[in-house]
Swiss-Prot record:
A single GO BP: DNA repair
Keywords on record: ATP-binding, Cytoplasm, DNA damage, DNA recombination, DNA repair, DNA-binding, Nucleotide-binding, SOS response
Name of this protein: Protein RecA
List of residues binding ATP: G79, P80, E81, S82, S83, G84, K85, T86
DNA-binding found in the keyword field: yes
GO cellular component, one term: cytosol
CDD domains documented for this protein: RecA
Gene: recA
Pfam families with a match to the protein in the record: RecA, RecA_C
Function: Can catalyze the hydrolysis of ATP in the presence of single-stranded DNA, the ATP-dependent uptake of single-stranded DNA by duplex DNA, and the ATP-dependent hybridization of homologous single-stranded DNAs. It interacts with LexA causing its activation and leading to its autocatalytic cleavage.
Compartment annotation: Cytoplasm
Organism for this UniProt entry: Chloroherpeton thalassium (strain ATCC 35110 / GB-78)
GO molecular function annotations of the record: ATP binding; ATP hydrolysis activity; ATP-dependent DNA damage sensor activity; damaged DNA binding; single-stranded DNA binding
Family, similarity comment: Belongs to the RecA family.
């Protein structure tokens, strides 16, 4: 009986070994045909930490779970008008350029503001910009730039402005049902693989529309059909929640961003920061909020203190101080970043780190 059991186990092992041998041959064949990394085991060393491009916001980078927008993926930024969508995308371009990357901006809205982009830290001279005449042209330009493998980040502003050629050639009032949705679906099928191979971040800015006749749930939806929702690895919902005033003058907006979808880390995190008119994301204001939250800067009533020294009374006073004292800003920034990395490492044992949708 024992001999029969041993013989049966040997036979099973032989079958397993033969299967493994055939599998390895198939993997080798696929790698020869399609290149290294075309197929891999999740436990292989080839799977490394996701390379990213910073958003320009410390808190949003942290909320994204990997330190920024993942390279080789599609990102959708959507929200109401004047909520900060383009500002956030321009900050990402500036960060990519600072890291030595090449950036492109497909301006389908024909509304690119050079002076504002320069204020956000973008090198205008090296930025590739296109103002296409139709949706097909915009997506064709995007595909060509992505397939070149030389572009690190590309922004399409916006999906709503990608007008199909047939609609442009038609008469006002002609019904063109589903043309834009079909255009986006077809383009994204082609783009997804190319974006992954080129390690480029593709940001699509989108607008909101109201669905007609919705009684329950949110009536809001994004333009361009459902394809972008599925193909995007990260979706960011950006909204302005309050005005920032200097006396009676409105100088900016308090902005809330929710990570609605995230395929590289846990989703549904929400962050808030200031967007100042003409300056973009207020890194100083954001740093103060995070430093207080992490206990690096102490707040008692309206007074702020750091390492037993009083910084000032009121948030705006502290912002002015940190703007003037770069050394102090850098010192607090380094401590905040160090603590946030520590928090991320402590929370990195979660098994379920992706959104299903």
């Amino acid at each position: 009986m024992a001999k029969e059991k041993a013989s049966s186990q040997e036979q099973e092992q032989k079958v397993k070994d033969e299967k493994l041998k055939q599998l390895n041959l198939a993997v080798e064949s696929l790698e020869k045909q399609f290149g290294k990394g075309a197929i891999m085991r999740l436990g292989d060393d080839a799977v490394v930490q996701v390379p990213v491009v910073s958003t320009g916001s410390i808190s949003l980078d942290y909320a994204l779970g990997v330190g920024g927008l993942p390279k080789g993926r599609i990102v959708e930024i959507y929200g109401p008008e004047s909520s900060g969508k383009t500002t956030l995308a321009l900050h990402a371009i500036a960060e990519a350029q600072k890291a030595g990357g090449i950036a492109a901006f497909v301006d389908a809205e024909h509304a690119f503001d050079q002076s504002y982009a320069r204020k956000l830290g973008i090198d205008i001279k090296s930025l590739l910009i296109s103002q296409p005449e139709s949706g097909e042209q915009a997506l064709s330009i995007t595909e060509t730039l992505v397939r070149s493998g030389a572009v690190d980040i590309i922004v399409v502003d916006s999906v709503a402005a990608l007008v199909p050629q047939a609609e442009l050639e038609g008469e006002m009032g002609d019904s063109q049902m589903g043309l834009q949705a079909r255009l986006m679906s077809q383009a994204l099928r082609k783009l997804t693989g190319a974006i992954s191979k080129s390690n480029c971040v593709a940001i699509f800015i989108n607008q909101l529309r109201d669905k007609i006749g919705v009684m329950y749930g949110s009536p809001e939806t994004t333009t361009g059909g459902k394809a972008l929702k599925f193909y995007a690895s990260v979706r960011l919902d950006i909204r302005k929640i309050a005005q920032i005033k200097d006396g009676t003058e409105i100088v900016g907006n308090r902005t809330k961003v929710k990570v609605v979808k995230n395929k590289v880390a846990p989703p549904f995190k929400t962050v808030e920061f200031d967007i100042i008119y003409g300056e973009g994301v207020s890194r100083i204001g954001e740093l103060i909020d995070l430093a207080v939250e992490l206990g690096i800067v102490k707040k008692a009533g309206a007074w702020f203190s750091y390492e037993n020294d009083k910084l000032g009374q009121g948030r705006e006073t502290v912002k002015t101080l940190l703007k003037a004292d770069e050394a102090l800003f850098n010192k607090i920034y380094a401590q905040v970043k160090e603590q946030m990395v520590g928090l991320k490492l402590e929370g990195s044992s979660d098994d379920d780190s992706s959104s299903d949708s």
